[in-house]
């Protein structure tokens, strides 16, 4: 991961609030982790869907930015998430990758796993700036 990408990802106050950690961001792929904590729970004691979406969106953004020099060069236009199973505790790993990198738009996909279990799957379109 480039130093610039690492600085961008780790300087987000929202990412720090959630506890996101960038493990990799290079070549159109990113891997982020999130450890479940009480601040991320919904009324049912499970991981809030908004926190899971934020993990996915951030991973996709890092994958997109990694195609260049790591600086923010795109924004999310739309994103569809399939929430597959609830999360009560533990660590999540999100892997995001660029499926199509055009001049004006990019299509990305992501999967979130807890161990071997698939937690969520997503697809999005980004606009290139």
Task: Label each PLM-derived region with a short phrase.
Residues 1-129:
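Terminal targeting signals and extreme-terminal segments of soluble enzymes
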